[in-house]
Amino acid sequence: MDYHLCPSILSADFNRLGQQIQTLEEEGVKWLHIDVMDGDFVPSISFGMPVIRSIRKESKMFFDVHLMVSAPERYIQDFVDCGADSITVHAEACEDLERAIELIRLSLIHI
């Protein structure tokens, strides 16, 4: 079984985000965990597609995107398009869990 150190971008200093991601890559980190929060499904708001798209241009790490949002199936393709390599959703957040899983599988990324 493979194990991966997967630091969370949520703990980054956003004033130095690019530099910190570069440091992680230089240290051999292969995966980056990205918590996307919408302020509805969870009380906090983090960031979304523009941030992921921006860091994807600068990073070859595996992006493990955790959608902590209401009705995540509405956004799956958008997150795939901006660079997610893996998407995790909460079953209770989905309006249609089967559809969410189908969309992730059809995108050929990891669930």
List where the protein language model places each region.
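Extended, positively charged loop/linker patches that create polyanion-binding surfaces
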Residues: L97-E102
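Conserved small/polar residues in nucleotide/adenosyl-binding loops
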Residues: I109-I111
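Conserved N-terminal beta1-alpha1 strand-loop-helix module at the mouth
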Residues: M1-Q77, D81-C82, T88, C94-D96
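Anion (oxyanion) recognition and catalysis
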Residues: R105
